[in-house]
């Protein structure tokens, strides 16, 4: 098997653990505390990586304007996204939050049409319709919709997906070296989460096995998986095939949540996921041909 496929598979397996890992941590640790500590760990790992590889020298070539843009990207794309997603995870089951999180590629299509002036085609509209049908199916059971926490959890996950979709479009326009920009972005996320967390939460000491969870989230999921994914795409002869493999992640995430959190895999969740991911794949496979 080619190395890029091994990198891609490794990344997908790591990403699939995110919902269950965060959900388990949020049982005992406030949302923004978990986000702040894991983000600083991700920043430190990427800092060491960039120093070791010599990439850190390139940071001098960036102007204050560049750092302002990168910081803005970090605030919108990963601080707001993560804070909202963590809140959604705390209110919903991990499978519900994970599925709603995968609306971000559809949000990317919407923002690409608005910001990049890409053409809205019938295929894109059909893809959006499929994904929003998935939202309706997912929201139609698994608890009382009159429950304000559930409604807020659903809204938070949808807005989080919109933030990440917007980030993906703006990041594409910015075109910075991702190893350096992600290092700065995780620092920004850590600082924002630290400030907001200290103002709004009562933080608790991190003990024993909780540090393993923090390291897994901050270093492995936030940093290592990103680097592996970049290597997978860089070494691929067919980037589209590798990119589409990422949509296995939510399906694997359902299985991992069922094993480690004892969450029952509900039929409506699977059907909703098929609609949402089906809409994304429809756009990816046929969207370009229709333009």
Residue map of PLM features:
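Helix-helix packing/entry segments at the starts of transmembrane helices
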Residues: 35-37, 96-103, 171-190, 222-259
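Loop-to-transmembrane-helix transition segments
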Residues: 3-13, 57-84, 152-160, 205-224, ...
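Hydrophobic/small/kink-forming positions within alpha-helical transmembrane segments
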Residues: 13-16, 20, 74-79, 83, ...
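Hydrophobic transmembrane alpha-helices of multi-pass small-molecule transport proteins
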Residues: 46, 111, 120-142, 160-161, ...
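Specific transmembrane alpha-helical segments of multi-pass solute transporters/efflux pumps
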Residues: 18-19, 47, 53-95, 137, ...
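Hydrophobic/aromatic residues within transmembrane alpha-helices
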Residues: 25, 34, 38, 88, ...
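C-terminal transmembrane-helix exit sites in multi-pass transporters
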Residues: 45, 50, 104-129, 250-270
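Glycine-/small-residue-enriched transmembrane alpha-helix faces in small-molecule transporters
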Residues: 1-38, 144-173, 189-195, 256, ...
